[in-house]
Amino acid sequence: MRNTFLLVIPLFLMCACSSDKNGKVPGIDLGDLDTSVSPKDDFYAYANGGWIQKNPLKPEYARYGTFDVLNDLNQERLNAMFTEMGELSPVQGSDDKKIVDLYRMAMDSTRLNAEGGAPLKKYLDEVYAVADKASLVKLVAKLHSDGSSCFFGTYVDSDLMDSSVQILSLGQSGLGIGDRDYYLDEEYADIREGYLSYLSKVFELSGIEQPQQAAENAFAVETRLAEVSWTRLQNRDIEALYNPCSSGQLNTLFPGFDFDTYFKTRNIPAQDKLNVEQNSFFKGMSSLFAGTPLEQLKDYVAARLIDEASSYLSDEYYDASFDFYSRQMRGVTEKRPRWKRAMAVPNSLLGEAVGKMYVAKYFPESSKEKVLEIVNNLRQAFGEHIDALDWMDDSTKAYAHAKLDNFTVKIGYPDVWKDYSALSIDPSLSYYDNLIAAARWQVADNMTKLGKPKDKTEWGMTPQTVNAYYNPTTNEICFPAAILQPPFFNADADDAVNYGAIGVVIGHEMTHGFDDEGRLFDKNGNMTNWWTAADDEAFKAKAEILVKQYDAIEVLPGLHADGRLSLGENIADHGGISISYSAFMNSLGGECPEAIDGFTAQQRFFLGYAHVWGQNINDEEKERLTKQDVHSLGENRVNAALRNFQSFFDAFDIKEGDPMFLPEEERVIIW
C-alpha cells in the first residue's frame, strides 16, 4: 500500500496552482472554518470551528451536527408533503390516505389528551387477567406478534451460513433502559432511580393500583434480565451469535419457557433450523421466567407495554417519557415539536411510500449517475489497494477481489417499491390501536419471508434516510437519496470535496465488507473463513494497533474511548479515507487541479471529509455514546483517523512536533 501512495504523493506535492478558474461551485464554505486554529494543532476545530459557532446545540438535541441539519431539512420537506397531500383529499385505501390519516391522528392533541391512557386499557386488562404461566407464554407470543419486545425478540433474516435462505432468529431483548450496564453498574444509580420514578408515574397514569410496587416488580425482572444479557462488545462477536438448532430442541435447551406453546400460538410451524443468538441469555431468561412469581412477571409485561406506548398517548405520558429518556439520560432540554413527532410515524411505517414521493420531488437522476461513477472509481481503487497489500498472500487476495467484484450497489431508491396495500389504517380507532395494527402487519410481513430466498431488490433503509449501510449477508452497499446532497454530495462542487465527503462514505461502507466482522463473510454473504492463518493473524495484529490508538483518547476527564467496541467503524473510517483519496487522485489522471479559495485539491479533500463530522454535543451524550455506540465521536472520526495518513500530513505541511502528527511506526492503515 505504501508503494501505491508513494507513486501518487509526488504528483500533488508538485502542485502549486493558486487561481480559481475551474467554474465549479465551491463545496467548502469558508465561514465554516476557524482560522484562529492551526490545522497542525487541531484539524477538526480548524475545519469546523466556524460551523460550530454558527450552529449552537438546539435544545431539542443532545448532539447537533451536519447529519441533523440535513435531517431537519428532510423533515420540513416531508411535513410540507404530508400537509399538501391532506389538502388534496387522497383516495380511500391509498398509501397517501394512510400517510395523511396517521399524521392527522398524531397531530390531534385534543383527542389524544382526552383519551389519556384509555387506548391501553384493554391490553393491560389482558395482561392482568392472566391466571398462570402457561397463559402468560401465550400472551407473550401474541404481544410479539403485535411488535412488543418483552423478554426476547424474534425476526426473520438470512441464515449466516447459507444466505440463500431466510430463517428465524431469537435474540435478547426486553430491557426498558436498553443497555445492561444501566442496571448493574454503580455509576448509574441515578439513572435507575429516575427509571423507577418514570415507571411509577406511567403506571399511575394507567390506573394501576400500587404503581410504585408495580414499578419495583418490573424493575426487578428487568435487572435479572440484564444480569444474563450480553454486553455490547459480546454482541459484536458474529460467530458467537450463531447457534443453530431446531424449534423442537428449544424446550430442552431452555427449560422454563414453553417454546412449543409459544410457536403454536404464533402459528409458526416447526422449524428444522433456527438461530439462537445468545444461548446463555435464553438459559437465564427461561430460568427467570420459571422462578419468578407470576404477579412480578405481569407487572414487567405491563411496564413494557406502557413504556412502548408512552410516546404515542397523551401529553402526560409523553412528558414522563421525555423527562427520563431525553432530559435525564441525554441532557435534552426541549421536546421536539409535535409535527416532527407526527411525521416520524408514517415516515417509518410507510417508509417506501413516502420515499417514492420524496425521490420524485427531490432526487435528480443525474445525481445517481454521478455517484455511480464515484462508486466505480472507488471499487477500482480498492482493488489496487488489495493488490498492494504486503501482509496478505495471493490466495486471500483472490477471495478479497471476488468479494469486492460481487458487491451489489444500491443508489438513491429501490427498483421495486414495497406494497402497503395490506396495511389498514382506521381513523375511527385510537391512534395507538392503529399503531398496534401497523406493527402487527410489519411482523407478519417479516414472517412471510421464513424459508424463502432473500429478495435482493429489498432495501434495508428508506430513500429519505440520511445514512448509508453495508449488509454482509447480501454483500450490498446502499446509499439512499437523502444522503446524496450537500454537504455529502453536490453535483456542481469540485471533485475533491465530493470524494472527501460522499466518496469517503462510500469507501466506509465498502470497507465494512472487510472489517473485523465483514471479513468473516464471503462474496455470497455466507459466513465462512477465506483467510489463511497467517493473513488472519496479520489482520488482527493491525487491528490491535487501531484499538490501542482509540483506547488512548480521553473523551471526558477520566473517560476514554472504547477502541474495541468501535473497531469495525474505525476500520471503515480509515478504509474510506484511504480508498477514496486514491480514487480521487486516480481520477485526476496526473493533472493538477487549480486551487479554489486558496486551497489545493488535496486540502479540499480533507476539509470535505472533516466537515461531514462537524457537530455540537453535550457531555451527557458524549458519555452515553462513548459507552454504547460502535461509532467514534465526530471529533475523533476526524483527528484520530487522519493522523494515520501521510497524504494528510503532506497536504497541510504537518511535521514531527505538531500536535496532529503521529510517528510513522505508530500509524496503521489496514486497507
Regions found by a protein language model. Name each.
Residues 224, 253-257, 275, 279, ...:
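Intrinsically disordered, low-complexity linker/terminal regions across diverse proteins
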Residues 60-82, 211-228, 498-504, 597, ...:
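Short secondary-structure subsegments characteristic of cysteine-rich extracellular domains
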Residues 32-53, 182-204, 392, 567, ...:
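Hydrophobic/aromatic-rich, well-ordered segments within soluble, folded domains that form packed cores
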Residues 85-373, 377:
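Noncatalytic, helix-rich "gating/capping" subdomain that lines the substrate-entry/channel surface
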Residues 13-16:
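C-terminal motif of bacterial Sec signal peptides marking the signal peptidase cleavage site
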Residues 18-20:
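Bacterial signal peptide processing site
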Residues 1-5:
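Positively charged n-region of N-terminal signal peptides that target proteins for export
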Residues 38-41, 46-111:
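Active-site-surrounding "flap" and adjacent substrate/cofactor-binding loops of secreted or lumenal enzymes
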